[in-house]
Amino acid sequence: MNLPKIELHLHLEGAAPPAFVRGLAAEKKIDISGIFDERGNYAYTDFWHFLKVYEAASSVLTTPADYARLTRAVLAESAAAGVIYSECFLSPDFCGGRDVGAWREYLHAIREAAEEAERQDGITLRGIVTPIRHFGPGK
């Protein structure tokens, strides 16, 4: 049976396909080779190592255009798996470096990409704003 799916706990950066991250890193000449295993998947040993890999993978996302591309890549992959609705956690700690003006630009880029995905692939994205708890309350 092929039922439509919903995704209720998706972190946009965490859902970044490894091939997308490798490609963007290559374009920007950023070395992130240590975050992948021999098969090209993300490699981590425990939760704290996972957080470091997550941050390293996210480090290639530096502009609103990068987040638009990421949004399209994640939603295309989700739609191909039968997802029709996704609730996505978004953090100003990653998108825009805690700058409210930049945050708006990133959200605008994400929203435009999500609207394009909805028109093309029939998948709806809604955002949930969240802090990054391991950064601590001071940030």
Regions found by a protein language model. Give the residues of each.
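Metal-cofactor-binding active-site regions of metalloenzymes
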Residues: 1-139
